[in-house]
């Protein structure tokens, strides 16, 4: 039996849901293929959305009318703004989510989307004619003819779970792996690699001694992810905090040989910034303890996720470890932690549209491209789904640049540098992070979404209202001006150069906010709190944007500079251990080569340029 679609999306995880929604919103008749409808939107690992760098991605997805922000707002049970004490450009909105509420909200969003069908079935193979994908073949003989396919396999591509010496072929616990598609990709000539991720044991919250633990509350004023969310209405909860002990560390060291990671059973590389507890003890064993956040998985679910003790140790060792951790001495383990290996495709096999170079019409998104994290997957899914719809319709595909979105930074990093370990988004990866803030994602991307036809009427009305208020506030701030003497009479001391400064320029000063300006011009008192905060943020950053452009231009000017082979990077202050190791091992020949290294950041590149200059000057002095 053959059914006809414009776009077929394979997989109902975070990448697949965004891809299917984006393709359908773009006008493509879309099929989302998954083994079971009730697994759509499942949070496979940690029950949280957002965080540093990741929260920016969620805001960008929302700005293009994607799903993740709205679903997270509906399911969030502990909202916190990370890096609150730092500048707005690096603050990270995050929420812990109720797993059930998140899954159900995502399923409802998929169910309500026009032009989108959910097809339950197992994908066995693709039909490819003259270098172009033409159909998806399902178990049972069903054929889905199509103009484009988005493949979002997550950890299912030849997935293999490890619990100590025990191995289970699975995509995640109790769900079958995808073996046929891995063979399909291999036959097509794709360069495949092996990666690994892990998850901690799940605990019964009723058996945890909460009274003995430190607690962490949600923010009193939760900040939603979505422009479409007026406020958070889901009840907010507290989390518990505990730490590993010296007894924990001794037990882990004594059993390292039984860990799948350290026994040689696992060939895949794990995420550097989400290490297993075994890795933490081996690499940072001199610490007194490692923090563990005890995160309830739902409002009516006693399951607790102990964030910080991901492991592939045997089940009996995991039980003994729990007994050494304060508050968990009598905890019941509902499911053991495990590591999972899976295949991924070298992302350099992709165009920046996320279409593969080998097969026209085939797009990849999510962990198959070597990333880690729900948010990274969702961002890729949105872009891949949009471009798949445009490919099927014969339209021009979209590339997001590094200057306009973190999604663009991520895709450029992946497709130009490749990966040797799972890729995670950080704000430090962006050259233009002062202008790529979480608070202005809508202004950067919603007009583009409207132009592409994927933003709803309701979204555009809400966006128009927000921008109307912001533009009015900007105009008012620029219309009011005062001299240094006038400012001094209001208690503000600035350079007495006789120059009149607008209210907008005055907002760049640390002691000036909209409330201060209201003392000078009462009209400012009518500006609402959200608009005021955004106006203050952009005004304060405006004075640094020219410097940001200059720094980026300087780095580009230095790209041709050669790096002497004798330069030692091991002791360079300010350079991360990751990059010290990579610079020492790979010895890039030039600044341009260093810039293309996986994990390189604009700030790190500036440090390397300065170090090479210093080294060359020192060598000349010696000569």
UniProtKB/Swiss-Prot annotation:
Biological process (GO), any one: tRNA wobble uridine modification
- Residues spanning the signal sequence: none
Coiled coil stretches, renumbered: none
The UniProt entry lists the main location of this chain as cytoplasm
Residues annotated for NAD(+) binding in this entry: 270-284
What cellular component GO annotations does this protein have? cytosol
Q: Name one GO molecular function term.
A: flavin adenine dinucleotide binding
What family is this? Belongs to the MnmG family.
Alphabetical list of PANTHER family matching this protein: GLUCOSE INHIBITED DIVISION PROTEIN A, PROTEIN MTO1 HOMOLOG, MITOCHONDRIAL
Q: What HAMAP family does this protein's entry cite?
A: MnmG_GidA
What is this protein's record name?
A: tRNA uridine 5-carboxymethylaminomethyl modification enzyme MnmG
Organism from which the protein derives = Mesorhizobium japonicum (strain LMG 29417 / CECT 9101 / MAFF 303099) (Mesorhizobium loti (strain MAFF 303099))
- Taxonomic lineage of the native organism: Bacteria, Pseudomonadati, Pseudomonadota, Alphaproteobacteria, Hyphomicrobiales
